[in-house]
UniProtKB/Swiss-Prot annotation:
Keyword Ribosomal protein: no
Residue numbers on the Cytoplasmic membrane side: 120-238
Topology of the protein relative to the lipid bilayer: Single-pass type I membrane protein
Protein name per its UniProtKB record: Protein shisa-3 homolog
Span of the signal peptide: 1-21
Similarity field: Belongs to the shisa family.
GO cellular component: endoplasmic reticulum membrane
Transmembrane feature ranges: 99-119
Organism for this UniProt entry: Homo sapiens (Human)
Annotated region described as Disordered, given as residue ranges: 151-173
Residue numbers on the Lumenal membrane side: 22-98
Sequence ranges of Low complexity compositional bias: 159-173
Function, in words: Plays an essential role in the maturation of presomitic mesoderm cells by individual attenuation of both FGF and WNT signaling.
Length: 238
């Protein structure tokens, strides 16, 4: 068991030991020569170099590994690298550009959402029905009220006629009484007032639509003192 473990360690050192030593050198990047041929990059030292050839030397058009530090090639100043030829003039973008793009998109979404919300609130909201203004017309009110007044006053016509007939009969009776009183000598009785007729017009301020029936207006009688020694008959019993 121990012999098998020692054999594995030996094989690993033989496989990775020299390669690990070679990985300590510089890396020569790929380049394009004068004829336009591209050469792949390699790690110093290469398989055919000595172990101390860990520095990338030469020129931009021809690169190799060497051990002299003064012959070291500054690969950063070369412009014939393949990536420089494929993408000439490309510079690194600033770090804040992606954040600026994301922020602009976010602000655009906010503005668009606000516009859509305002449109939905103003245009898609159901409109309330407008109320018609109530217009009051005096003429229409009088037209509607006049039939009601006429119908309410029509049943009173017989009573007015009866009152007129009653007043006429009472007037006639009073005239007869006063005529009888005049026949007695020595009694002075004032003449009765003239009966009210329809020929006498009474001007009353009344609104249109109302009917005023003619009424009997009784005139008061002034009593005169009786003469001494004379008696007047009493007609109250009649």
């Amino acid at each position: 068991m121990r012999a098998l473990l020692a054999l594995c360690l030996l094989l690993g050192w033989l496989r990775w030991g020299p390669a690990g030593a070679q990985q300590s050198g510089e890396y020569c990047h790929g380049w394009v020569d004068v004829q336009g041929n591209y050469h792949e990059g390699f790690q110093c030292p290469e398989d055919f170099d000595t172990l101390d050839a860990t520095i990338c030397c030469g020129s931009c058009a021809l690169r190799y590994c060497c051990a002299a530090a003064d012959a070291r090639l500054e690969q950063g100043g070369c412009t014939n690298d393949r990536r420089e030829l494929e993408h000439p003039g490309i510079t690194a973008q600033p770090v804040y550009v992606p954040f600026l793009i994301v922020g602009s998109i976010f602000i655009a979404f906010i503005i668009l959402g606000s516009v859509v919300a305002i449109y939905c609130c103003t245009c898609l909201r159901p409109k309330e029905p407008s109320q018609q203004p109530i217009r009051f017309s005096l003429r229409s009110y009088q037209t509607e009220t006049l039939p009601m007044i006429l119908t309410s006053t029509s049943p009173r016509a017989p009573s007015r006629q009866s009152s007129t007939a009653t007043s006429s009969s009472s007037t006639g009776g009073s005239i007869r009484r006063f005529s009888f009183a005049r026949a007695e000598p020595g009694c002075l009785v004032p003449s009765p007032p003239p009966p009210y007729t329809t020929s006498h017009s009474i001007h009353l301020a009344q609104p249109s639509g109302f009917l005023v029936s003619p009424q009997y207006f009784a005139y008061p009688l002034q009593q005169e003192p009786p003469l001494p020694g004379k008696s007047c008959p009493d007609f109250s019993s009649s």
